[in-house]
Amino acid sequence: MKKLFVVIICAIMALSVSAQRASSSSSEKAESGVRFGIRAGLNLSTLSLVEDNHTYTTDSRAAWHVGAIVDIPLMQSLYVQSGLYFMNKGGKESEGEAKVTYSPMYLEIPVLASYRYDFGSAAQLQINVGPYFAYGVGGKEKMEYDGEEESDDFFHEDSAKKFDCGLQFGAGVTFASHYYLGFAYDLGLSNIAKNSGDSDGKIKNRSWMISLGYTF
């Protein structure tokens, strides 16, 4: 896993250098150049489940995320935005006195096409869409019943796959060239359930996010 993230980070850095060179050689490129930033915020996450041909969604679970981003200009008003996030997702289920809380944690890399529109010098709107790739690094599956608690690793060998990918849609506003407020939605497309035998079970991540940030 370490080798994978080293390769990804090197690729992002290479894209940054390439974009900087391109932006200096064409009048059509964005003038601001490559920029970096930090992001943090809250998630409202659920799991979409299919079991015995029946589809349902867990109750939502409040969680959080934190990470760093890179903005790479391609053309005027068009950027690629990527980064690396530590993302907490999951959901909740309850039936009678029994409750189950899922809290998987991921390292997540979005690769987004980002359209920008300036409202003078005061604010800039951005609309983002693109794939995300995530790898599970921890988390628990906690069960509560009749006052008793029991927990297990979310990614134990018979439960969930660590790799996840999907689409991210989002929008945000940058104020005074630095301060960011944004919203996004992660639509998981990978079935992260570890099926065995004839099981047709499916589990997919869903997550709404609100982020605050600072762009350098």
Short names for language-model regions:
Residues S32-V34, S60-W64, S103-I109, A123, ...:
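Residues that define the transmembrane beta-barrel architecture of outer-membrane proteins
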Residues R35, T55-K99:
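Glycine- and aromatic-enriched membrane insertion/assembly motifs of diderm outer-membrane
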Residues Q20-A63, Q124, T215-F216:
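Short glycine/proline- and aromatic-enriched beta-strand/turn motifs that initiate or cap beta-hairpins
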Residues L78-V80, S177-F183:
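Repeated loop/turn-to-beta-strand initiation elements of outer-membrane beta-barrel proteins
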Residues T46-T58, N88-M105, V137-K162, N191-I203, ...:
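Flexible, solvent-exposed loop segments that connect beta-strands
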Residues L42-T46, F86-G90, E108, Y117, ...:
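Transmembrane beta-strands of outer-membrane beta-barrel pores
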Residues V173-T174, K204-F216:
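Outer-membrane beta-barrel "beta-signal"
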